[in-house]
Amino acid sequence: MSILFYVMFLPYLCGIHATNMDKRNLPENSMNSLFIKLIQADLLKNKISKQTVDTKENHQSTIPKPQILLDLDGDDNMKQDFQPVISLEAELVKQQKQRRYKSPRVLLSDSLPLEPPPLYLMDDYIGHSTVVNNRTSRRKRFAEHKGHRGEYSVCDSESLWVTDKMNAIDIRGHQVTVLGEIKTGNSPVKQYFYETRCKEARPVKNGCRGIDDKHWNSQCKTSQTYVRALTSENNKMVGWRWIRIDTSCVCALSRKIGRS
């Protein structure tokens, strides 16, 4: 734009200075020299401005852009099957305040549990505590079991706290690693699982107790259900997942061939 202005202004400037040059006997190329100097000054100014802009753009391009974090909670399937954990210590405090999805069969504690969860009976519990064989304890156990006299279970089961669970199958069918010892604060915390399983497949000779063996084949089988636990997959992606654990003993029946 400046060069165009100089080109348009040149004839006017030449007309004004023509008379003066005649009177003062100025050299003929004085106007050309003036015009060339003005153009050079303008070009130099534009070049400096352009270099300044390029320098700013290059500096901005070298600044690293912030990494985009993926929102795992945005995917509904991922949110249901896997919930990532950033800080284990903060997550433990959060679990103490929130009881949603919390199963009594999963315990996070710094010491070995000596009793079953409050919601489960102690009839079939085989814990690590010693039993004191005295008259008071026998009377207490008799009073607790008094209401169960005359009742029999089709299958015999046993329940215990599993303290060394290392692997499990999650709700997607993938094998995951169960976090054993979790380092937080002063003392480490471990995960304990209260599991129930069958003592034996056939409590009686022909299968389950109380089943008509003339018409039915029966067998006691351990059943599983899903609980939430802190796990990792391929030594990464630590978070809460639904995993299968043993929770009951049921009697499986099948009709004998040739029987109606």
From Swiss-Prot:
Residues 1-18 form the signal peptide. The keyword Disulfide bond applies. Residues 19-141 form a propeptide. GO terms for cellular component: axon; dendrite; extracellular space; synaptic vesicle. InterPro entries: Cystine-knot_cytokine (IPR029034), Nerve_growth_factor-like (IPR020408), Nerve_growth_factor-rel (IPR002072), Nerve_growth_factor_CS (IPR019846), Neurotrophin-3 (IPR015578), NTF3_N (IPR045815). Its main location: secreted. The keyword Lipid metabolism does not apply. SMART domains: NGF. Seems to promote the survival of visceral and proprioceptive sensory neurons. This is Neurotrophin-3. It comes from Xenopus laevis (African clawed frog). The lineage of its organism: Eukaryota, Metazoa, Chordata, Craniata, Vertebrata. The gene is ntf3.
